[in-house]
UniProtKB/Swiss-Prot annotation:
Species, as recorded: Mus musculus
Name by which UniProt lists this protein: F-box only protein 46
Biological processes annotated in GO: SCF-dependent proteasomal ubiquitin-dependent protein catabolic process
Phosphothreonine PTM positions: T347
Subunit description: Part of a SCF (SKP1-cullin-F-box) protein ligase complex SCF(FBXO46) composed of CUL1, SKP1, RBX1 and FBXO46.
Phosphoserine: modified positions: S21, S67
GO cellular component: SCF ubiquitin ligase complex
Length: 603
């Protein structure tokens, strides 16, 4: 009896039925490979399966050449290729665990040359439906590019085995673990052109490798560090809108609606290595390269849009009278390169800026700028950034006039009680030459972190001091506070008394009375209780009156009792009406006769 006639689908199970010889690989037609598994024609089981099954090996597989180029995923554990079939396609029921394993293996091994020979046959049930996910990932028009950039390269290094030898069976977990191990090793050796993984690059010595803080460096990179060494990260390159001068797969930028923190926003030209090549195949900044950035021929100019700069000065030509943008340049390199000016608008190179001046006490070096739209967020160290043009905001404000409210945190504190600010001239003076030793890289990274953190915390503290409410009332003397409180109504005094213990003590000690208070001050009636809530006046009482307008009702001696106005079921419940205390039990001075005369006049 044929095995395929019993079940509408076939499951791949490596144990305990037999070995891998029951499932044959399907090599692509463009790049033929030798059979990975023993040939079933020479085994113990005859080949009586139908021809439409995917486990049937093609007839041309035996004549494939055995010499193959270097593998992509077989960088480690080369002796296990006979055991683990990474290039095998099986007929698996959709939704099964083995289908996910097959997808994982297909994504790791499948290149542009494999998609043409893959076929999906619907033999999984009466509905004859295809695996949509498999059909989508193996579509010839959307085939993923080869990781190494080479076409026709086999995914595994095949070691043909004899048909009579027994092959050790491997479980699904072992196969997945080995595939993940090989994929990790392959990704380290062969970085993809467009990597969506978050990577941050920190500039180091030009021409020298950057030493990380304990993490490994990429084998194909130049002066770059991993995520654990940096402070921020680059987002996925496909989520941001196209940048002028960068293709879609090359631009690094933030996601939509994201706020970045850009440290020392600057722009420099390409570095000239001694051999004429750029490290890591990228251009634009010394010791900094993007994954998939253009080659040495094309220089990627990053557009940096700073909301803070645009808020203060939309253009450099029309500046306010009290704001100046000074360009603090670092020392020029030996080649005599001139740094390209960084502007809020991405425009062609402008005429050379005015020479930098020393800001003195009124200058503040902006190292940390909170931005809303930043197309590139780059961290520059103090080692390889000689051709860096930095901007220093200098505010000229006379000491007799008050500082503008929106620019207070740019001003340097004149008093001794303010926190000290770093002078703007300390950055170029601490830049070492490119011929220094590699031991300064770690110290420069630590110095960069400390410098950036200090500036960020200092600016945040100044912004918080700007935005927080000024508590001037706590500094006023008590007699001034009593005079102020005497002009406040009952609700305002009650709020102040419940808010601050200092205000509560002053109100109760001095007996502050509200402007709308109805307590009778007459010595004959001041001890009378409130006619609504029956509360007596106490010194400093600015509370609100709560009462029930209708009397308390009790149905039965043991039954339910309630207030007749609001149907509340307890006698001690607070009143449903809220107002002011009133202990005036006597009618106004005109008395009843005055009211009667008024009614008679009205007739």
């Amino acid at each position: 009896m044929d095995r395929g006639s019993l079940l509408p689908f076939q499951l791949w199970c490596p144990r305990p039925f037999s070995k891998y010889s029951q499932n044959q690989p399907r090599p692509p037609s463009t790049a033929l490979k030798p059979p990975v598994c023993p040939d079933t024609s020479s085994g113990t089981e005859p080949d009586h399966r139908p021809a439409h099954l995917e486990s049937t090996p093609p007839a041309v597989a035996a004549e494939a050449p055995t010499s193959q180029p270097a593998p992509l995923l077989s960088t480690a554990a080369s002796g296990d290729e006979g055991r683990v079939l990474l290039d095998t396609w099986y007929v698996i029921k959709p939704g099964n665990t083995k289908e996910k394993v097959a997808f994982f293996v297909a994504h790791q091994c499948g290149g542009s040359s494999r998609a043409s020979s893959m076929k999906v046959k619907g033999h999984w049930g009466s509905d004859s439906s295809k695996a949509k996910r498999r059909r989508r990932c193996l579509e010839p028009t959307k085939a993923p590019p080869d990781q190494g950039g080479r076409e026709g390269t086999p995914a595994t290094e095949v070691t043909p085995t004899s048909s009579g030898d027994d092959v050790d069976l491997v479980s699904v977990a072992e196969m997945v673990a080995l595939v993940e191990q090989r994929a990790a090793l392959a990704l380290q050796s062969y970085p993809r052109p467009s990597t969506p993984a978050p990577v941050v690059f920190v500039s180091a010595d030009q021409g020298g490798p950057a030493k990380g803080l304990g993490s490994e460096r990429r084998s194909g990179g130049g002066d770059c560090s991993r995520v654990a060494e940096a402070v921020a990260h680059f987002e996925a390159q496909r989520d941001s809108p196209p940048t002028k001068g960068l293709r879609k797969e090359e631009r690094p930028g933030p996601g939509p609606g994201e706020v970045r923190i850009a440290f020392r926003i600057s722009n420099v030209r390409e570095p000239h290595s001694p051999d004429g090549n750029l490290p890591n195949g990228g251009g634009g900044r010394p010791g900094c390269a993007y994954p998939g950035s253009p080659g040495p021929g094309t220089r990627a100019k990053d557009k940096i849009t700073c909301d803070l700069y645009q808020l203060i000065s939309p253009s450099r030509d029309a500046l306010p009278s009290n704001v100046e943008f000074l360009l603090a340049r670092a020392d020029e390199a030996s080649e005599g390169e001139t740094p390209a000016p960084t502007r809020p608008e991405d425009t062609p190179p402008a005429p050379p800026p005015p020479p930098a001046r020393d800001c003195g006490a009124s200058g503040f070096h902006v190292d940390v700028v909170v931005t809303g739209v930043v197309d590139a967020c780059i961290f520059f160290g103090k080692d390889g950034t000689k051709n860096v043009k930095e901007e220093t905001v200098c505010l000229t404000v006379s000491p007799e006039e008050p500082p503008p409210p929106g620019q207070l945190f740019f001003l340097q504190s004149r008093g001794p009680e303010g926190p000290p600010e770093p002078p703007p001239a300390d950055i170029p003076s601490t830049v070492p030459g490119p011929d220094d030793s590699e031991g300064t890289t770690d110290t420069s990274l630590c110095r960069l972190y400390r410098h950036v953190s200090h500036d960020f915390l200092e600016i945040r503290f100044k912004i918080q001091r700007l935005l927080e409410p000024r508590q001037y009332m706590l500094l006023l003397p008590e007699h001034v506070l009593v005079k102020i409180f005497s002009f406040l109504p009952t609700r305002a005094l009650a709020a102040l008394k419940c808010t601050c213990h200092h205000f509560k003590g002053i109100i109760e000690a001095f007996g502050v009375r509200a402007t709308d208070s109805r307590w009778s001050r007459d010595p004959l009636y001041r001890d009378d209780p409130c006619k609504q809530c029956r509360k007596r006046y106490e010194k400093g009482d600015v509370s609100l009156c709560r009462w029930h307008p209708k009397p308390y009702h009790h149905d039965l001696p043991y039954g339910r009792s309630y207030w007749m106005c609001c149907r509340r079921a307890d006698r001690e419940t607070p009143g449903c009406r809220l107002g002011l205390h009133d202990n005036n039990w006597v009618l106004p001075c005109n008395g009843v006769g005055g009211g009667r005369a008024g009614r008679e006049e009205g007739r």
